[in-house]
């Protein structure tokens, strides 16, 4: 099976040999691809809607993988028991929905060896949540497809039972986000690739890195540079259109744009020779 560039990038983040749970599977393209390619022995394809799940089941049967890919009607991780999968893939959904799923099933999330996440919106909020909860970032990727930019990440959840603990509820991050990174034996080879974290070193993410991805900035990802330059041009154009205008609303909008430009330019400094 051939995947789109976005789905190919998502699939490439999954560790070979892992049992897969694809949450919001839609057409089941990722589970089919991973099993067909020998990257995974088995997979569970899950979706909250019967229509997409039925279509996914048809694709699985057409691929001849029905004995190795199980279909489940499930709201997020609801029907996945702890220990049933090594990797959860959650791709192609908005950031707020992704966060709701991660927060709703902390025991299941904490039982996973890794998660591969590809939020369609509010990526910075997803990164901030993961860092605050103690997830370890192993890899980040950014793909441009049909004029849109798709960030994705491979993370390891904390395995100390701290996910969803009451003392973390309502935390409001004001200081730089700190991530204590520990070695993960199963990803030792992964950690030497571009876009990977450094599991042996304590890490700190500032606001710019949370917005755009610390690992992407560290590797000077070319697609991220293109994205930042585009975002800079858009905001400069808007500011130019506000020239000569006044009023409280206009002043507030200008201030907002200038703050965004400051972060964009901090990101672009990583590409300076």
Task: Label every model-predicted segment.
Residues 84-92:
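Short SAM/SAH-binding signature in class I
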Residues 1-18, 32, 50-83:
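S-adenosyl-L-methionine
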Residues 104-157:
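C-terminal substrate-binding/active-site "lid" region of AdoMet-derived donor-dependent transferases
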Residues 42-47:
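Conserved SAM-binding motif I beta-strand of class I
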Residues 17-26:
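Conserved class I S-adenosyl-L-methionine
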Residues 158-169, 174, 187-273:
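An accessory alpha-helical subdomain
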Residues 27-40:
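Conserved SAM-binding loop of SAM-dependent methyltransferases across substrates and taxa
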